[in-house]
Each structure stands twice: as C-alpha cells, then as structure tokens.
Swiss-Prot record:
The modification N-acetylthreonine is found at residue 2. Keywords: Acetylation, Disease variant, Membrane, Nucleus. GO terms for biological process: fibroblast growth factor receptor signaling pathway; platelet aggregation. May be involved in mitogenic function of FGF1. May mediate with IER2 FGF-signaling in the establishment of laterality in the embryo. One of its GO terms (cellular component) is mitochondrion. Highly expressed in heart, skeletal muscle and pancreas. Expressed at lower levels in brain. Also found in placenta, liver and kidney. The gene is FIBP. This is Acidic fibroblast growth factor intracellular-binding protein.
Length: 364
C-alpha cells in the first residue's frame, strides 16, 4: 500500500520595517546596529549583540537584492525569488519612493542631471540627510522622469501604472517631473517660505489647466510629434495670453474694471482703501505676468513674479487671506462685464489657475 503526500514549502521573506527605514535613510550596518541597540531592542528581545549584528546584516543583504526590483516595481510583483505578501510589497515600494521634504525642496525645478547630482554633497550637509539617502531620492526622481517623459496621457496615471505608487505619492512625483521639465525657479530667497506642498498644489492646477493635456484632445495621427500631453505647457495658450494685455493697455477698460471691482467690494474688504489705491498696479502685475509667458525665462520665473507682483504688495499692506480671496474672485469675475473685452475663455483659463495658486502662495 502506497501513501501520497502533498508537500508545500514556504519561505516568506521577513521584512523588519525599522531596519528598512534605517537602510533607506542611508545608515551603514554598524550605525544601524548602534541605533537599534539605543532603541532598547536587546532588552526587549533578550538577543545578544552578535545576533543583532547578524540580523541587521541579513536584512541589509535582502534589501540590496530587492533594490534592483524596486527600480521597476512591477518586476517585484511578478518575481518568484522573494515570497513577499502583496501588502508588504506595497509598503516596500511606497517607502522606497518616499522622499524628504527638505531634500525635494532643494532640487525642485532643477534639471535632473549629473550637474545637479554633483551638488548632493552640499545638500546632504545643509539638510542633515545622509548622502546615500540623497542619492536614492535623486535617482528615483530621475528614473521616474525618464520613464514618463515621452508618454502621452495623464502624468499621474502613467506614474501609477509604471511605479505602483499611491495616488498621493504619484501626484507628488507628477509635480516633481512637471517642475523639472519646465525648470521653474524655486530657489530664490524670496521663495524660501514656500513649501513643496505649495508648489505641488500649483503644479497640479497647471497640469489640469495649462498643459496640452488640459485641452482634452489627443492627436488622431499616432505618428504625430505632439508635445507630451501633461509634461509641457500649451505653447499656443501661452502665446494667446498676450491678448490679455488690453486689460491694462486700454485706459478705459482698466478704469471700468477697477470701477466694477470697487463697486462690488465696497464695505466688504477691511483693506478696501489699500485695494483701491493699488488696483492698477496689482492688475498690471497679474496681466503682465501672463503676457510674458511666451519667453522660457519668464516661464521659469513665474513664481518669483507672482510673489513680487502680488503677494509682497498685499502682504506689505497687511491684507488678510479672506480679503485676498474676495478680491481675486471679484477681479476675475468682473472681466465678464467688460463689453469691449473679447477673450473671456482665455481669461478664465488663465485666472482660474492663477487665483488658486495665489491663494496657496499667500501665507507667511
């Protein structure tokens, strides 16, 4: 009589999240062991220092082997070498591509090239983030950029599809890629008060409204050389923005626009007199920013110009955010009552995004 046995062999790869964090943060095995000892793990587990050293080294070896798969996350899901539950795979990917705000703030808008990579030593010293971690984060930004730069369609969707990131992290990477592609200036002293979140918020608005993808029309010819849908600003839209100059060049239109805004806001703004006195300067600033966006340098200086032409003047007159919101809403809407103005749709596409950005940028 024979018996049949079904044998299953399991070899689940164990992932210690704390050790993974130390590895991601760029600590050597020696430093990681020291930090684990300091956390009290020996007392908690009754392990010896030698066992802790061996455990840490084993984890580091596993992470090094996993790293090549993390460079192309779908490969991690389909490989058979490491038996890792799906929830653990998602954690490994998400944390590998996570970044430090202090680091991304230093490289945001810069070209993701060898030249910038040479500055990582200085960035590491300035931020206190280990050089190894800086390199990982920079290489991640560059890798995502290279994969999606030639793709059509939604930037966020492309990033999620190829890197399996959460929606929030994919949106952050879309902002990083968008800023790197358009080279927006973010490093000037007057912009240092702005966080990555501020810039990412504005990037999302611009991607939704100012890029070729925002037009919502993909090329019918598959061989078309149309610019990347969500990566590049719509150049035709930027050229058309020069038409808005009539709002400040035509004295009658400017006076009527001011009259409409002042009539609507009288008694509603705490800074009404300041707004009335500065209306023309503020309007010229906002319209001239639009008219200059035909030049690459002025596109790069967009945030510098917005802070100089609008945020700083309002801040110096102590406008509360609520008054800024009231003003921008009425300033935008009143243009629809100007009979001599014929570019309403263009104005709405410009100011709809600019209004959201300015409200986000207006803080201490």
């Amino acid at each position: 009589m024979t018996s049949e046995l079904d044998i299953f062999v399991g070899n689940t790869t164990l992932i210690d999240e704390d050790v993974y964090r130390l590895w991601l943060d760029g600590y050597s095995v020696t430093d990681a062991v020291a930090l684990r000892v300091r956390s009290g793990i020996l007392e908690q587990t009754g392990a010896t220092a030698a066992v802790l050293q061996s455990d840490t080294m084993d984890h580091y070896r596993t992470f090094h082997m996993l790293e090549r798969l993390l460079h192309a996350p779908p490969k991690l899901l389909h490989q058979l070498i490491f038996q890792i539950p799906p929830s653990r795979q998602a954690l490994l990917i998400e944390r590998y591509y996570a970044f430090d705000e202090a680091f991304v703030r230093e490289v945001l808008g810069k070209k993701l090239s060898k030249g910038t990579k040479k500055d990582l030593d200085d960035i590491s010293t300035k931020t206190g983030i280990t050089l190894k971690s800086c390199r990982r984060q920079f290489d991640n930004f560059k890798r995502v950029f290279k994969v999606v730069e030639e793709m059509r369609g939604s930037l966020v969707d492309n990033i999620q599809q190829h890197f399996l990131l959460s929606d929030r992290l994919a949106r952050d990477y879309a902002a990083i890629v968008f800023f790197a592609n358009n080279r927006f200036e973010t490093g000037k002293k007057k912009l240092q008060y702005l966080s990555f979140g501020d810039f990412a918020f504005c990037a999302e608005l611009m991607i939704q409204n100012w890029t070729l993808g925002a037009v919502g029309e993909a090329p019918t010819d598959p061989d078309s050389q149309m610019d990347d849908m969500d990566m590049d600003l719509d150049k035709e839209f930027l050229q058309d923005l020069k038409e808005l100059k009539v709002l400040v060049a035509d004295k009658d239109l400017l006076d009527l626009h001011k009259s409409l805004v002042c009539t609507a806001l009288r008694g509603k703004l705490g800074v009404f007199s300041e707004m009335e006195a500065n209306f023309k300067n503020l309007s010229r600033g906002l319209v001239n920013v639009a008219a200059k966006l035909t030049h690459n340098k002025d596109v790069r200086d967009l945030f510098v110009d917005l802070v100089e032409k609008f945020v700083e003047p309002c801040r110096s007159d102590h406008w509360p955010l609520s008054d800024v919101r009231f003003f921008l809403n009425q300033y935008s809407a009143s243009v629809h009552s100007l009979d001599g103005f014929r570019h309403q749709a263009l104005w709405d596409r410009y100011m709809g995004t600019l209004r959201g950005c300015l409200l986000r940028l207006y803080h201490d």
